[in-house]
Structure formats: C-alpha cells, structure tokens
C-alpha cells in the first residue's frame, strides 16, 4: 500500500495508543512522577469528571519542577500543560502528524465521541507506523550510503 494514501485513510486507532493513565489536578507531582515511572510512560492525562483538563509530561517535570527548584509536593495542576490539543480516535493519521509537527507535541490525548480519554498517542507510535511502510532494505541503510558494511548487520 501507498504511504500517502494510508496516511489519509488509517485512523489514530490503528496506532494502538497507550492506555490513558490519569491523575487528578490536585494530586502531587511526586505521585504523578511515581505513576509515570511505574507505568513506564512519558506523560499522564490530568482529568476532572472524566474529561482531560491538562497533560503532565516528562518535560513538565524537568523544566517546570526540577530545573525550577520547585517542591514535588506541588499539585500537578500548577505545572501541567492546560487544555492540551486532543485528537479523536477516528482522525486520520496524516492530519495528526501535521498537528504534532506544527505544535511541537510529543504526546496527544486521544478521545472518543463523547470526549472521554481513551489513550495517548506518542511520536514513538507514529515512527513505528512509518517504519512499517518502508522496506527492510531502506531501513537498514547506513547513515552514509558511501560506507559499505564489512559484515551483514547482526553477524
């Protein structure tokens, strides 16, 4: 199949977004960081009454808390990114890639028809999807095509 065509017809659901791990706005940064570590994720959705009100990412933790010397007891609401851009699970992948690139986003909440969070889409999932569309010959090329490997990869 043609990548350009697939980017228009394949939806976000095809990317198998990660589960929407959540914290409440009043939970501490320490609690959020512990959950991120436990679940091995780069972000958490901050939800109130079943709706996304913010997103708390590794970047938020590093820049707004640790680098700023703020206490880990702060509520997540004080350092989260409020009202993040959200994508619908049926939205075409191509449109989502464009939004992520334009906004510089690495994670986006995925919502259903009722606006409830159903997942988180990461750049990593997008990269895996794109790699599926290239032959192994292209993916295994050396960074400099003039370099000829001395042995087959994995030998």
Language-model segments: which ranges?
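Tandem CBS (Cystathionine beta-synthase) repeat/Bateman regulatory domains
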Residues: 1-155
């Amino acid at each position: 199949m043609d990548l350009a065509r697939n980017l228009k017809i394949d939806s976000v659901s095809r990317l198998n977004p990660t589960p929407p791990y959540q914290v409440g706005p009043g939970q501490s940064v320490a609690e959020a960081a512990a959950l991120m570590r436990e679940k091995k994720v780069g972000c958490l959705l901050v939800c109130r009454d079943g709706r996304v009100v913010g997103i708390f990412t590794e970047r938020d933790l590093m820049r707004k808390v640790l680098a700023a010397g703020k206490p880990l007891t702060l509520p997540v609401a004080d350092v989260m990114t409020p009202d993040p851009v959200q994508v619908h699970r049926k939205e075409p992948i191509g449109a989502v890639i464009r939004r992520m690139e334009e906004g510089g986003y690495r994670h986006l909440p995925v919502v259903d028809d009722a606006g409830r969070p159903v997942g988180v889409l990461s750049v990593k999932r997008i990269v895996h999807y794109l790699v599926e569309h290239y032959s192994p010959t292209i993916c295994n090329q050396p960074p400099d095509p003039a370099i000829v490997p001395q042995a087959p990869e994995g030998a």
